[in-house]
Amino acid sequence: MNDAKMTINRREMLLGGASLLALGGAAAYTKAMRAKPTVRETGPAISAFLPERDLAGLGHPMTAYAKIGGVELSRLILGGNMIGGWAHCRDMSFYDRLVKAYFTDERVFRNFRIAEACGVNTILTNPALMRVINRYWREEGGKIKFISDCGYKGGVIKGAIASVENGASMVYCHGGHADKAAVVKKDWKFFREYLDESRKLGVPVGIGCHSLATVKFCVEHDCLPDFWMKTVHRVDYPTAHLGEDRWKLQPTGLGVYDNRFVDTPPQEVFDYMATRPEPWIAFKVLGAGIEHPREAFPVAYKGGADFICCGMYDYQVVEDVNVVNDIFANGLPARPRPWHG
């Protein structure tokens, strides 16, 4: 397929109605969530597809960085859920297959190259992506760092070992495993073993979760990680359906509905995380596309998040980096929770 046809095909696929509901970064925002007519994005969003315009509109690369356990990270981290096929697109079951078909190795490389050019120096994803990350390092000369969620067929400890062996700079316990252990099984020994064994690998070790109860459980049992990977997003969008089942876990540890991982009001999350001195990487900040980064990022950072992990297609990276640069234009914004990292 020639470049012109490829550009058109990509444009048509990504600007369809389903994409507007699911895209993880800037183009994900749909004005339907504000009870207004949906507007098809044009202009800069489309021109970003053109190879010669990859970095068009970038004010400057990121300047906001901080360290967790000696590892320097950009305050904005590239999320890998979409690349791995975990798209979180409400009830549209086809979408996982769609993003898997879209994200060939070459498109993953393109995403990484643009992220690095914009100053985003870290990808956070699953061990399933180790192959393509290592290929990118080897064949493209990329330097992007890798944080692993350790979700692995042999368990999270084996996932941590495999991840570090394949170049991970940091690891954390996948939120699904952590929520199941804390909220469903009340198994504090799970966390103690994970932390003890993973720390033998010599990298920072975190705990991920969707439920605030998981953080509280770990603190109560003195299972303290080097960092938290905790969700936060608005819960007043029209499809939230808040009610008695707003936060119920199935035996698997997953929520009753897709994208219903964190229906805890954001302020409640911010208030509790303000009591924790460990660095906090916030994720699902856009709620799988219910909010634009211009609205969601400032709330998350000023509410207490030290870093944001956000899934971004190649054409979304520039806009998202510009948003973060604006937030940190005059240094660290004032907020109730001290900055960590």
Label for each model-derived stretch:
Residues 317-337:
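C-terminal helical cap(s) of enzyme catalytic domains, especially alpha/beta-barrels
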